[in-house]
Structures are given as structure tokens and as C-alpha cells.
């Protein structure tokens, strides 16, 4: 896991954005092999255009849990964005309330280590957080209102994620295949990957069938 993050760093369409409405924070050392970053608003923001409206989401081989917190209406929503194969524009609304966004970005191969469910066949979709992370949602959501800053939310979330981390769900064949593809800069043939991982082409297809 540690070697992979040194070989591969997924980025967004605007990787250098860093302001009050969008900021990426690197996780603690223990979570760094599993979490690409935390991101969101640095603090609650009021009455402004949705900054994401001028942006675009590109396939980044990551999955995101996103919480939108509305301090004016005293409510929140949470959803999971799975792996996307296509780009699409986001936003386009005017935010009149005081709101905040907080999100956890997983590598595609690590989200399952914090979930109670299976992600097979769930690509290009968005789901309610509780469908895949019911225990994490139950513990985290009640705390979101009480901690206004992004840094504060990260502190409590890291503690919960470390408790939820289940490394026994790691698929070694998957990790070996990913390592080989990254090591060869994506030029490896399927037959080469099968030889490296000692699995059949059919089994390899099942492993990558999201």
C-alpha cells in the first residue's frame, strides 16, 4: 500500500485550487496509504455562488464520501460517489444559506476496507452514504454540526476511520495487479498481468469488475 501512493497520485481537474470553499488536506501518516485526501470548505460559508459550477469532475480512480451541511436549515445530506468513467460539469446553483462541505476521498482499491458492503457493479453512480458506510455515517454525522472547521472535522474523522479500517478485506491479487500496472506505466498486457499475479484472465476480469 505504501509503495502505491509513492507511484501514483490521482488529481482533480483543478489540482491547485486552495481557498475557503475548496481545500484538500493530506491525512495522517497511518491513513495515508488508504485515504487520498480530505477536502471541503475550510469553514462554513454564506450566500455565494456554487464555486463548483465552473468546474468539471474528471475520472480520477477515486471514490468520495461527501457531506453537505446546512447550518441555516439545521440539516445535512451525505452521499457516496463511486468510480466514474466519464467527465461531467457540477454545480450551477446559488447558495443562499450558511453551508459547509466535508468529504473523504478514497483510492478506488481502499474504499472497501472501511465499508461493510461490496462495490461490485456500482461504478458511475451516487448512493446514500448509509448504503455502504452505515456505521461510519451513524458515528460521524451527529458530530458534523459541532465542529465548524475542516481541520476539526478531519481530526474526528481520522479517529473513526482508524477504528473502521479492516485490512483483512485487502485482495492481494488486486493489489499485485495494480502495482504491476503502475510499475509498467500502464503498458502491461493482460497476459503479463496474469503472469505477474498468477491468476487467470477470467479471474482477473472478475477482480476488476466494478
Question: Across the structure, where does each feature detected by a protein language model lie?
Answer:
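Alpha-helical bundle regulatory/interaction domains
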Residues: 1-175, 181-191, 196-201
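HTH DNA-binding helix-turn interface
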Residues: 207-210
Amino acid at each position: 500500500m505504501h509503495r502505491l501512493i509513492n507511484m501514483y497520485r490521482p488529481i482533480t481537474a483543478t489540482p491547485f485550487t486552495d481557498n475557503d470553499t475548496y481545500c484538500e488536506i493530506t491525512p495522517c501518516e497511518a491513513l495515508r496509504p488508504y485515504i487520498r485526501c480530505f477536502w471541503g470548505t475550510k469553514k462554513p460559508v454564506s450566500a455565494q455562488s456554487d464555486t463548483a459550477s465552473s468546474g468539471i469532475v474528471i475520472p480520477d480512480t477515486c471514490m468520495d464520501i461527501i457531506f453537505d451541511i446546512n447550518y441555516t436549515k439545521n440539516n445535512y445530506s451525505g452521499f457516496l460517489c463511486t468510480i466514474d468513467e466519464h467527465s461531467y460539469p457540477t454545480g450551477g446553483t446559488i447558495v443562499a444559506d450558511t453551508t459547509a462541505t466535508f468529504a473523504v476521498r478514497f483510492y478506488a482499491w481502499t474504499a472497501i476496507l472501511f465499508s461493510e458492503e461490496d462495490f461490485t457493479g456500482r461504478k458511475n453512480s451516487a448512493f446514500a452514504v448509509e448504503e455502504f458506510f452505515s456505521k461510519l455515517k451513524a458515528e460521524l454525522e451527529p458530530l458534523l454540526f459541532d465542529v465548524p472547521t475542516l481541520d476539526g472535522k478531519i481530526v474526528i474523522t481520522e479517529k473513526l476511520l482508524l477504528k473502521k479500517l479492516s485490512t483483512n478485506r485487502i485482495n492481494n491479487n488486486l493489489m499485485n495487479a495494480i502495482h504491476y500496472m503502475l510499475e509498467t506505466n500502464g503498458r502491461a498486457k493482460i497476459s503479463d498481468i496474469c503472469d505477474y499475479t498468477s491468476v487467470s484472465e477470467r479471474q482477473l476480469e472478475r477482480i476488476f469488475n466494478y
